[in-house]
């Protein structure tokens, strides 16, 4: 473990039930699920880098689906998204012990996530923000994993060198992005086959 640890959110620190969003939101909008999902996942990346707000995202999705984006409906969709996000996210049992142990060792902690605008509220409510030195969210900084730029930005915020940092993520491609700038990447795979060098638990990284 280096002097700094960069940690992903979704799939690493917490689980989320995106399939619930994929079912409930199109029902609320009165749109066929397949039509909604095709439009949503084509447009959603713009939200992940802060180019559109969640409300603007739903306006665009509704228009693409041939539905008039009534202001009331858009508000309902945004509210439902946040409600589902907060209700269905669950910290993995090793997440807070891992972050707390890092703090006790004096290891700087950065949260690095590809996400939309409501993630900060979520991770604040779960106690993650209080344990972090730096929080880098793609929607706020306009940078996204696996681009090396988001890792360089995070290292700059932490004021540490790449060789002194470790990055933990459930996506192998994102770990490779960190390694491209000299940060050691560790993939966490909680279920299924364990690739070489990957870990099953965050606590395995502590040594």
Give the location of each predicted region.
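N-terminal helical cap/lid subdomain that shapes the substrate entry/recognition surface
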Residues: 1-93
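Hydrophobic alpha-helical bundle segments that form small-molecule/ligand-binding pockets
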Residues: 66, 102-103
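Asp-based, Mg2+/Mn2+-dependent phosphohydrolase catalytic module
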Residues: 1-7, 96, 100-101, 107, ...
């Amino acid at each position: 473990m280096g002097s700094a640890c960069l940690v992903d959110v979704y799939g690493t620190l917490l689980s989320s039930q995106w399939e619930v969003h994929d079912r409930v939101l199109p029902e609320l909008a009165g749109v066929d699920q397949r039509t909604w999902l095709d439009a949503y996942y084509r447009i959603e990346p713009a939200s992940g880098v802060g180019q559109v707000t969640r409300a603007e995202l739903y306006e665009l999705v509704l228009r693409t689906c041939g539905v008039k984006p009534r202001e009331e409906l858009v508000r309902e969709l945004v509210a439902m998204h946040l409600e589902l996000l907060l209700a269905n996210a669950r910290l993995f049992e090793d997440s807070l012990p891992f972050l707390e142990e890092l703090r006790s060792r004096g290891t700087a902690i950065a949260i690095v996530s590809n996400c939309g605008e409501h993630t900060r509220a979520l991770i604040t409510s779960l106690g993650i923000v209080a344990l972090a030195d730096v929080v880098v969210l793609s929607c706020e900084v306009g940078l996204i994993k696996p681009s090396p730029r988001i890792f360089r930005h995070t290292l700059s915020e932490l004021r540490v060198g790449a060789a002194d940092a470790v990055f933990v993520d459930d996506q192998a491609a994102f770990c490779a992005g960190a390694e491209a700038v000299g940060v050691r990447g560790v993939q966490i795979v909680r279920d299924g086959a364990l690739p070489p060098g990957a870990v099953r638990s965050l606590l395995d990284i502590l040594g």
